[in-house]
Amino acid sequence: MKRFHSFIVILLALVITFVIGLGTPAHAARQSPAVYTSDQLDTLQKYAANVQALGDRLPELGALVEAEDWIHVSNFIRGPFGELRARLSRVTRNLLVKDQEQARQIAKKAAEALESLDRAAQDNNVQAADANYAAFLTLYNNFFSLLP
């Protein structure tokens, strides 16, 4: 009878553990929301405004590329646009999970386009600079198309 009682206690403990495990919030936390909350939208708008502030300066960069002012192109990329990757990452982290990977890829390619533009400026390569500036503009606009 003592063995039977021990067996029942162990079985009951396993059943209770299993039932409690099904109802934990960890399972619910793994499922991401399909829509934005108002707090998420506010945060996204704040971070996107910081990225947009840099975007408002893109015509300046374009004018420098067009004028083939390579020193100022490099300074501009390393100065005001030096924070771009971090700012894009902040926005990306606050997107819905389904959009984060695509945003991460676009942000990475945009940063690579800026780095290539900087290399082209150092090499005085007009064609590469024009191509990388155009690629960056496209990627920048594609990134903003993911935002709500």
Regions found by a protein language model. Give the residues of each.
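Bacterial N-terminal signal peptides that target proteins for export
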Residues: 2-12
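C-terminal segment of classical bacterial N-terminal signal peptides
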Residues: 16-25
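Immediate post-signal-peptide N-terminus of mature secreted/exported proteins
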Residues: 24-75
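C-terminal amphipathic alpha-helix
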Residues: 40-44, 48, 57-60, 112-148
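Amphipathic, well-ordered alpha-helical segments in soluble domains
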Residues: 50-57, 80-83, 87, 106, ...
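A structural signal for long alpha-helical coiled-coils and helix-turn connectors
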Residues: 62-65, 69, 92, 99, ...
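Short, charged, amphipathic alpha-helical segments
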Residues: 74-79, 101-108, 127-137
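Short, solvent-exposed, charged loop/turn and helix-capping segments
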Residues: 84-104
